[in-house]
Structure formats: structure tokens, C-alpha cells
């Protein structure tokens, strides 16, 4: 696939997917560097979140549409490789949080809501943050987005309970 010229790939309808696959190694390295550059802030957010209460911290991975799949991938891995004595890792779609918060959120559980969002403008992503903020007594937010100008990043910029990572 990588040996075909762009016109051949376009004719096959494979030019975009091939380009995305080809850029993955570089993007993973970029993402690792973003993590390293923000490690102190991430560690501080996790320490603050753990200090919110006794017992395990509920870590909810959420997103809308394809961004929801990130949490579906992270949570099972972290349940296996992460510290499950300190953290309860759960993937929950934004639409589930918005439509039935009592089914997915516990008001008394200290929570870290990790939101994945490409644009940071999807109504359900923004609503999930607001619903969680109103419903959960002790909550912190980690926003991972591609868009510094998106509402998710902009609206949490001055929030001491939020950290936004731009990838």
C-alpha cells in the first residue's frame, strides 16, 4: 500500500487512510513528548484528585463519537496494567453521561473525568463536563483535545480543577 503513488491510492479510495497510517509512528512520538512536557502538571492533577477523598478514585474516560473509542481502549488496558487499588477505570460515552447521569456517575465518588475530543466543540462533550460538574461533588477534569480554540479547552482554561492537553 505504501509503495503506490497518490493517484493509485486515490483511485482505490485509500489515500486518506494510507496517509493516516503512515504518519502514526511520528504522531506517537509527538504524543509521548506532549506527555513528557506535561508530566508535572499531570502528576499534580492526579495527586489533587486522589486527595479529594478516601478509597479509589473513579477515572472516567469519555468522548463523543469516535473519541469515545479512546476510552474503550484505555480502560481495559489500565484495569490490567494500572494501579486498581488507587483507581477505578471506566469508559463511559458522553451521551450516556448526559442522558442518564445517575446510572453512570456517583455523586459521592471522587472522580477524574478524562475527556477526549478532536474539536472540543461537540455539544455532548461539553454537556458531559457540565453534567458531571453539577452531579459529582469532588471532581477534576483532564481534557485531551486537538483544538486550542475549541470550547472544551477555552472554557476550562481558567478552571483550577481542569488540565487541558493539546495533541
Predicted segments with their positions:
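Cofactor-/ligand-binding subdomain signature composed of acidic, glycine-rich
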Residues: 1-44, 48-53
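Glycine-rich phosphate-binding loops that contact phosphosugars or nucleotide phosphates
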Residues: 53-167
